[in-house]
Amino acid sequence: MAAVRGLTAVALRVVTPWQRSRLLAASRGPRALREVSFSSPEAGEGQIHLTDSCVQRLLEITEGSEFLRLEVEGGGCSGFQYKFSLDTVINPDDRVFEKGGARVVVDSDSLAFVKGAHVDFSQELIRSSFQVLNNPQAQQGCSCGSSFSVKL
């Protein structure tokens, strides 16, 4: 499928499940303090920031060439939703964000909706999951934190 830019294209894009993807939920261990530190971006381009708890959890669950893929797809109660999966294939339109040996990969269409945001791993009684925090491209989000509406 050719990469198509624009809000409508991303909203209507069909996202196929990644082969070998795993559910990224339950975890054990104490809740880590979330000290936000930044990955080094290329000048003039969008970036994703990885928190220390995100890096720590990725180092625990990834093997070999695996990385965390972040996608934005249409859906959820606010119009768009975040999708996390483990993957091993980097596509030509992907951007790789690395910190401390942990990698998060975002395709160029999704990056337009999350640039400047922080990827965190949160461990709570009701769930443990990767989350997007402080997304400057989001106008508002739902209470569960997995869907959002964009600023127009």
Curated annotation (Swiss-Prot):
Presence of the UniProt keyword Oxidoreductase in the record: no
Compartments in which it is found: Mitochondrion
Transmembrane segments: none
Pfam families for the chain: Fe-S_biosyn
Domain of life: Eukaryota
Any GO MF annotation of the entry: 4 iron, 4 sulfur cluster binding
Chain segment of the transit peptide: 1-6
Major site of localization recorded for this protein: mitochondrion
Gene3D superfamilies: HesB-like domain (2.60.300.12)
InterPro entries: FeS_biogenesis, FeS_cluster_insertion, FeS_cluster_insertion_CS, HesB-like_dom_sf
GO biological process: iron-sulfur cluster assembly
Keywords, comma-separated and alphabetical: Iron, Iron-sulfur, Metal-binding, Mitochondrion, Transit peptide
One of the record's GO cellular component terms: mitochondrion
Binding site for Fe cation: C77, C142, C144
Functional summary from the UniProt entry: Involved in the maturation of mitochondrial 4Fe-4S proteins functioning late in the iron-sulfur cluster assembly pathway. May be involved in the binding of an intermediate of Fe/S cluster assembly.
Family: Belongs to the HesB/IscA family.
Subunit details: Heterotetramer; forms a dimer of dimers with IBA57. Interacts with [2Fe-2S]-ISCA2 forming the heterodimer [2Fe- 2S]-ISCA2-IBA57 complex; [2Fe-2S] cluster binding is absolutely required to promote the complex formation.
UniProt-listed NCBIfam families: iron-sulfur cluster assembly accessory protein (TIGR00049)
Protein's name in the database: Iron-sulfur cluster assembly 2 homolog, mitochondrial
Organism phylogeny: Eukaryota, Metazoa, Chordata, Craniata, Vertebrata
Gene encoding the protein: ISCA2
